[in-house]
Amino acid sequence: MDRITELYHENFTKVLADWCKDHGVWYLGHNIEDNGAHARLGYGTGHYFRGQQEMDFAGIDVIGGQIVPGMNYHHDAFSTGGSNGEFYHYALAKLASSAAHLDPVKKGRAMCEAFGAYGWNEGLKTMKWIADHLMVRGINYLVPHAFNPKSFPDFDCPPHFYVHGHNPQFRYFKYFSDYVNRVMDIMKDGHYPAKIGLLYPAEMEWAGDYMPVEKPARVLTQSQIPFDIVTRDYLKQAEITDGKYKINQTEFEVLVVPYGEYMPEDLKEVIEKFCKT
């Protein structure tokens, strides 16, 4: 898995990124993160952060009722095996905002495609709740899904915000957009004061029994403790001095390590070095 995820970066994301740079355009998108796929193969890239390398924005997708008020636990859904509401509420947006903070290429830009396939009962009230949820977790670019040029009705992942005048809430969409744009514009130049790094446990998941990242993320979030999710790759490159480790421009004082049956030797060495300082 370690080599496979490196090869995915080298032969897919880097190739696309190089083309975009050569042609003067930004490169952005999202992986498939659903229900643990962010650290698995199949329909995932095997490692969220490696799958996002070289992109100018960190990206995620919130779709089909993944984030719903009160549904922050595992529950039945349209997807096989149900929906892991704990991951969607406490880890999904933090993956993107953490990558945006720690990868210098991204310059703090964290994007989310949102609102698709929630159905026609979603509405602007729910959309504002979802947008607020994402913004307080560090998302500062929103891609609304979707304005659909096809004739109404089209059954591809509604709601659609205009539908040639059939959506009665479209007249109010401007107020929602103005609000989100204003808040996100304020946030884009901010600095997130995280002192705690939460280890991304992909390598431990590949090797044996492990604790999913959303478990400690939930505890930290509900305790209102700011944190970023940090990876083995970032930790190996970190500057470690005076009891702190620095990744990009963020200085961390604490590293939270979820349970893992096995751990890569080089990761163990970095943690031991940090402990000794």
Feature locations, PLM:
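Carbohydrate-binding surfaces of carbohydrate-active enzymes
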Residues: M1-A58, V62-T277
